[in-house]
Amino acid sequence: MAILTLTIDGQPVSGTEVETLLDVAREHGIDIPTLCHLDGLKDVGACRLCLVEVEGSSKLLPACTTRLQEGMVVHTNTEKLQRYRRTIVEMLASEGNHHCAVCVSNNHCELQDLAYRVGLQYVRVPYLYPSKTLDATHRDFVIDRDRCILCTRCVRVCDEVEGAHTWDIAGRGIGCEIVADLKQAWGTSPSCTSCGKCVLVCPTGALFEKGATVAEMEKRTDFLRYIVTARKRREWNPDLLDEE
């Protein structure tokens, strides 16, 4: 497989044609913010936070789904991109009810971390104050759709890793939401295996364990890389991750 060379933020880097700009950037210590991306899941380019500028392209490109090309010159942190990212975080904040002080994921929330990172102190766009359905019918878990940012991590991990495909997206525009099966109560879902993978990969407090209180819902996603690596090698070995 041919090795391609390119430049990211003035730094010469290299990779293969099957790698994305996000892959290569992170391999070389260049941090590009994301919300929908998660190692082990297929990328969909939903959050648009990883948009980058590529010289010669008239539009911004999502780093998570853009494959390498020889001679690319990429910029990941220009003033234009900083404005775009701040605006995206503002819109995500305004479209939901994100009350950090009383959220189970306070201080463990990726959206909150990004808000700090982009310097978001106030939101310039009007809040929409949605009133979507909170579903606590499951024995162990709760989904608060007002905190959902539609990253689809839960949909993808349920489909690609667990193989259940309990979650999907229904509706359009501001009415778009995550639903279980044919828009039924989560607790009555015949396909849900109660594995909890969707809860662990959720970047906000939209999915959480019953009984969790303020700032207690610390998520972890390392298990996903472990499972994917073990399946790829067809070997269940606790040391697999250390070898990656």
Predicted regions and their residues:
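N-terminal cofactor/phosphate-binding cores enriched in small/glycine residues
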Residues: 13-70
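ABC nucleotide-binding domain "signature motif"
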Residues: 6, 52, 207
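Fe-S ferredoxin-like electron-transfer domains
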Residues: 48, 57-191, 200, 205-244
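Eukaryote-biased recognition of intrinsically disordered, low-complexity regulatory segments
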Residues: 1-9
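Extended, non-catalytic structural segments that build the interaction scaffolds
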Residues: 9-11, 143-144
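Short, conserved secondary-structure segments in the cores of folded domains
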Residues: 11, 43, 188-191
